[in-house]
Amino acid sequence: MPKLLPAQEAARIYHTNYVRNARAMGVLWALFTLCFSILMVVTFIQPYWIGDSIDTPQAGYFGLFSYCIGNALTGELICKGSPLDFGTIPSSAFKTAMFFVGISTFLIIGSILCFSLFFFCNAATVYKVCAWMQLAAATGLMIGCLIYPDGWDSSEVKRMCGDKTDKYTLGACTVRWAYILCIIGILDALILSFLAFVLGNRQDNLLPSDFKVESKEEGNE
């Protein structure tokens, strides 16, 4: 084996560190994506987007599709709503928000399923596919969060939050943790998408150009 020149040796060291850093970033991105998918499933299912306060006429809380409102006589919570039965969802805005947040959740889960493609396809391509899926998920979450308050004027929400409740005006009710997490999820999805694009470009440029040239020259010799 011919003795490496200093420039070639430096290029190999650079390449080794470059690959190691790219793999470490890839592992972190995958872990964050997995955690984010769990967060999105919880946000989609849990009915804690808005809820009662000490000033509301009735106790209760609302989610994207399910909600619970207290009985005026007994105080017992009566729960309704199902993602499979649109007729039980109290507002068309809630239905639309559920659709977009649901699609976003499936896109994030789909990006995790794409991890298996790393064994069969070019890594840069897989990263970029996941990046576009996560960017689309961020868009869906943004639309869902913007549309959801449009349904606050429904009769069921007014029964819990009071007559002062209207579109984008919550009256006596308060925003709950699931809605806040969904808003934070928009930023999370954008960051994950940006990181995936960066990782995809790093894979495209995995080898330094000078190292590629020198390697070709060695092969010709």
Curated annotation (Swiss-Prot):
InterPro entries: LHFPL
Topology, Extracellular side: 46-98, 150-179
Cytoplasmic side: 1-24, 120-128, 201-221
Subcellular compartments: Cell membrane
Superkingdom per UniProt: Eukaryota
Membrane topology category: Multi-pass membrane protein
Keywords assigned by UniProt, alphabetized: Cell membrane, Membrane, Transmembrane, Transmembrane helix
Membrane-crossing residue ranges in chain numbering: 25-45, 99-119, 129-149, 180-200
GO biological process: detection of mechanical stimulus involved in sensory perception; sensory perception of sound
Cited PANTHER family: LHFPL TETRASPAN SUBFAMILY MEMBER 5 PROTEIN, LIPOMA HMGIC FUSION PARTNER-LIKE PROTEIN
Annotated function: Probable component of the mechanotransducer (MET) non-specific cation channel complex.
Entry's family note: Belongs to the LHFP family.
Descriptive protein name: LHFPL tetraspan subfamily member 5 protein
